[in-house]
Amino acid sequence: MASSRVILALLLAAAAVMASSAQLDEKFYSNSCPSVEAVVRKEMVRALGAAPSLAGPLLRMHFHDCFVRGCDGSVLLDSAGNSTAEKDATPNQTLRGFGFVERVKAAVEKACPGTVSCADVLALMARDAVWLSKGPFWAVPLGRRDGRVSIANETDQLPPPTANFTELTQMFAAKNLDLKDLVVLSAGHTIGTSHCFSFTDRLYNFTGLDNAHDIDPTLELQYMARLRSKCTSLQDNTTLVEMDPGSFKTFDLGYFKNVAKRRGLFHSDGELLTNGFTRAYVQRHAGGGYKDEFFADFAASMVKMGGVEVLTGSQGEIRKKCNVVN
């Protein structure tokens, strides 16, 4: 009986996701703000030209937004009073680019006051971050509204880098995302960097023994040694490491090549090799011969994720500034 209730709940959640995402439209602003994509892209070209490493964080920010309360811009809200917002929760304390999101939103507000949501601005920025990193381009369905609530404790819905395969599949399924979405969106790790503390448990404390021999046995030894040379202790809270060594500013197939060799940075990356479907996908694209196929898959999964639990119509609001409600 309990399992039946769980299945019913998942089906109802999936139906709600599909209903809300169906209300999004690539041409939503064609009359009210036809220049919105050009305005966003102009700011993105300028910013990534000066700091190309910002692409990964912006993509990650959109992902973190969508997995908590849906793609409603709640990750952008500041904490207020006694209420701690998502951005100040532990999983989000390493997010960066909030100031740049505000700059882009200000440019959009200047062009079209009170028209385009922060959630839509962030979705467009994530798309352009990928495209300007030599990744795929896709049409972004628009029409999201901004949420008014942001709760730090709800960030437990975010898949942690330590997650095993069962945890990953459950967290993705809760957002109506399947195994293909899991392996495809994980490959967003082809751009960007990570702090050592997100993975040093694999190097020094995998089973809780906290000694030099307590390593993740699924991690390739030479790669492990290289990571140890950069992250010298569990207490390293500042060092940044490339997630896709050598091409962390380029959106390519490098992620799959690394994971196939057991050189995925996070434990969650390595877990993709424990399932037949995701392992086959990794191995197929590790060969480097199907870039267009992966790009199309990534675009499709980003559109699907971008429709998770969105607010539309008269729900929510259109924030004037992304860090505070109106």
Curated annotation (Swiss-Prot):
Catalysed reaction equations from the record: 2 a phenolic donor + H2O2 = 2 a phenolic radical donor + 2 H2O
Family annotation (SUPFAM superfamilies): Heme-dependent peroxidases (SSF48113)
Entry GO MF terms: heme binding; lactoperoxidase activity; metal ion binding; peroxidase activity
GO BP terms: hydrogen peroxide catabolic process; response to oxidative stress; response to stress
Annotated heme b binding sites: 189
Membership in a protein family: Belongs to the peroxidase family. Classical plant (class III) peroxidase subfamily.
This protein's name: Peroxidase 1
